[in-house]
Amino acid sequence: PKPKVTSREDAFIHAMPAYLGGSDRIGLKWVAGYEQNYAKGLPYIYGVMIMNDPETGRPVALLDGGWITEMRTPGVSGVTMRHVPGDPKHLAIVGCGLQGHRHLEVALEVHPGLTHVTAYDRNQGRAQEMLSLAGDRVTRAASSPTDAVSGADLVITTITVPLDPKLDCSNTDPNALLLP
């Protein structure tokens, strides 16, 4: 588990230290997620990465963790999608912020045969905006997370706060790939 601290009930800060022995690199990703930022017109997630000299511990770089997260997270999902057998036709995405957009791009690149894209976001405008990027595929903005995943054989959730009620995936395709 990631080390976590909180200053508010609907917020988190995670520390993710790492050392890569083969390349002798050491650093830390520090990510904050604050649900109440939506109402303030601010990004939900902020992050930085600090790289240190492995010999002395001296900080040598401070990097924008937001951009790195924006690219890395859907990249990992893309590798998973590429190596799971099958040719999905119906993609469902729950959460249509920046991660939802990037995951849509990756899913369409890895699985160009997708014919349907369903999306849910509590902000229906964001769902519609993201769906406009799906090209000539059949698209639908869902009324709930459970509605979004109905019949899907590829499900991606990009939310970091718990859904209430919990997401029920029992109505997905029995062979669906679920990427939380």
Where are the model-predicted features located?
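N-terminal ligand-binding/catalytic initiation module
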Residues: 1-70, 78
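N-terminal Rossmann-fold NAD(P) dinucleotide-binding loop
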Residues: 100-101
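NAD(P)-binding Rossmann-fold cofactor-contacting core
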Residues: 110-134
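Short glycine-/small-residue-rich Rossmann-like dinucleotide-binding loops
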Residues: 159-161
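Short helix-loop-beta connector
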Residues: 84-90, 113, 173
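Short acidic low-complexity segments
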Residues: 137-152, 167-169
